[in-house]
């Protein structure tokens, strides 16, 4: 889970014990997001970006899109607009693989797929799927 790829986890366990540990997560920085991650690290002082701030970043953009489509600040109108969204590009999709946000009738994201993150040299990197990996997976 995502708790295995946090700065607090590396502080508690130590870099030397984490190398090659893998975790399945809903979101983690992917290939092509270097500028976003760099900006996050500079602004927060955190050593790397994790699932929580990345998802929050996209969620804010999703709400913005829904408000614009609803043309209203009414929560029910926003909820209805959010349920109808179908976005495949831009910051609203940054946290998700594949980069599409569309919800089914149960409110689940259509086509959602997890990522595998692996600790390498004291930092967690996306290693699977290869199309969005920031580092190749290491097998020992």
Segments and roles (model prediction):
Residues 1-140:
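Extracytosolic ligand-binding ectodomains
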